[in-house]
C-alpha cells in the first residue's frame, strides 16, 4: 500500500487528472470482486442501510457512505477526501487501551501491528500473533524477538482446526484459496485460546467471516474490542457487522477507511458498558 497523494504531489508541476481503470492498466490481474458485483449495493441496500444506521459517529457514516458509493458508481471523487493513514489503522482515538491486556493479531504478516500495539500499551500482558505463511512467520518472530510475553503462531485463523490450501505468492495479500499450492494449518480462536482476550484484530484476506464464527465464545464471554477488515469482499461491508452483532448485540460500531484507494476499510466494535445495554 502506498500514499498515492504524496506520490502524485511529487509529479507537480506536471498536469494531474483522475483516471480509474485498473483492468486496463493491469490486464493480467484477476477481476476485482467489487468491480463485478456492484449490483450487491443495489440488491442489498437494506443491509447497507442497517449498518449505516448502526454506526456510532458522523465520521463513520460519512466514510462508509463514500466507500459504498464509490463501489457502486466507480466514481473516484468519492475517495477524494480520504488520506493515507496506515499508521493510525487499528488504533483510533476512540479506542482506549487502558483495560486492554491481551491482544490477538490475526494476519500478522510482518508483525508491524503487534509492534504498534506494544509501543502504545507498555504494560500489556500478552500478544498472540497468527501468521500462516512460513516466510512471514519468521519475519514476525524476528521483529518481536526482543519483547516479552509474545506468542507467534504459525497458523491461520478459521472456524475450526484443519488443513487448507494457501497461496503464499501474494505478499501481504497471501490467502486461503482452493488453487493454493501450499497446505497450512488453521485453527479457531475458541479452540486455541484459553485466556481472556481483550482486543482482536483481523486482516486475513477474506477469511474474516470464518474467523468470527470460530470466535463466538470469546465474543460472547470476553466482549473484546474488535478491528476487522471488511474490504476483501463486497458483502463484507454488511455481513461482518451483522454477524458480530448477531453473536453479541452489545457493541458500538465504527468505520474508518485508510487509503485513497479501494483497500484498508476497517470496522470497529467496542463493547458497550453494562449501563448502556438496551
Please identify what each model-predicted range represents:
Residues 1-278:
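Phosphate/nucleotide-binding beta-alpha loop and adjacent structural elements of enzyme active sites
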Amino acid at each position: 500500500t502506498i500514499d498515492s497523494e504524496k506520490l502524485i504531489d511529487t509529479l507537480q508541476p506536471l498536469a494531474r487528472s483522475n483516471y480509474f481503470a485498473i483492468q486496463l492498466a493491469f490486464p493480467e490481474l484477476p477481476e476485482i470482486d467489487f468491480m463485478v458485483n456492484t449490483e450487491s449495493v443495489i440488491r442489498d441496500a437494506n443491509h447497507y442501510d442497517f449498518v449505516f444506521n448502526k454506526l456510532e459517529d458522523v465520521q463513520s457514516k460519512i466514510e462508509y457512505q463514500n466507500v459504498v458509493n464509490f463501489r457502486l458508481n466507480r466514481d473516484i471523487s468519492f475517495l477524494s477526501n480520504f488520506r493515507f493513514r496506515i499508521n493510525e489503522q487499528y488504533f483510533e482515538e476512540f479506542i482506549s487501551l487502558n483495560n486492554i491486556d491481551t491482544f490477538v493479531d490475526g494476519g500478522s504478516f510482518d508483525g508491524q501491528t503487534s509492534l504498534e500495539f506494544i509501543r502504545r500499551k507498555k504494560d500489556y500482558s500478552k500478544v498472540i500473533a497468527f501468521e500462516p505463511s512460513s516466510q512471514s512467520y519468521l519475519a514476525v518472530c524476528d521483529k518481536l524477538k526482543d519483547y516479552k510475553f509474545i506468542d507467534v503462531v504459525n497458523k491461520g485463523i478459521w472456524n475450526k482446526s484443519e488443513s487448507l490450501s494457501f497461496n503464499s505468492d501474494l505478499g501481504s495479500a497471501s490467502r486461503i484459496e482452493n488453487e493454493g499450492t501450499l497446505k497450512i494449518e488453521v485453527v479457531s480462536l475458541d479452540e486455541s485460546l484459553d485466556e481472556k482476550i481483550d482486543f482482536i484484530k483481523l486482516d486475513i484476506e477474506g477469511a474474516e467471516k470464518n474467523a468470527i464464527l470460530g470466535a463466538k465464545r470469546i465474543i460472547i464471554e470476553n466482549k473484546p474490542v474488535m478491528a476487522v477488515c471488511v474490504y476483501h469482499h463486497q458483502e463484507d461491508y454488511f455481513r461482518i457487522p451483522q454477524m458480530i452483532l448477531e453473536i453479541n448485540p452489545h457493541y458500538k460500531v465504527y468505520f474508518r477507511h485508510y487509503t485513497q484507494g479501494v483497500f484498508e476499510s476497517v470496522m470497529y466494535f467496542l463493547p458497550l458498558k453494562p449501563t448502556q445495554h438496551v
